[in-house]
């Protein structure tokens, strides 16, 4: 299992992409967190409230998840990162793999 993470400034944008990924069986689950981000963008320090989304997918599908998130993301340069958990409950990983198999 791999977790793909990204951020959005509007929950509607996050939900739209998550719905697409779920319908296409590219992810089994998504979680949302409210976060505050500070970063330098085009020479200016920005402070924004964002929604961080964690997308749970199988190892075989994470490249497709990244491709779709990048293509549909409203940001000019989205943060898209992956996390490979040190441990995942085997039953949970089995469920993720089952739900993301066509």
Predicted regions and their residues:
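Positively charged, small/polar-rich N-terminal and surface patches that mediate targeting and assembly
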Residues: 1-102
């Amino acid at each position: 299992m791999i977790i793909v993470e990204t951020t959005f400034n509007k929950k509607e944008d996050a939900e739209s992409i998550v719905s697409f990924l779920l319908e296409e069986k590219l992810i089994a689950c998504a979680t949302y967190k409210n976060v505050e981000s500070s970063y330098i963008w085009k020479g200016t320090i920005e402070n924004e409230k964002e929604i961080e989304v964690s997308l749970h997918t199988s190892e075989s599908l994470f490249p497709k998840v990244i491709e779709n998130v990048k293509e549909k993301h409203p940001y000019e340069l989205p943060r898209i990162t992956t996390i490979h958990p040190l441990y995942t409950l085997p039953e949970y990983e089995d469920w993720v793999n089952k739900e993301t198999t066509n």
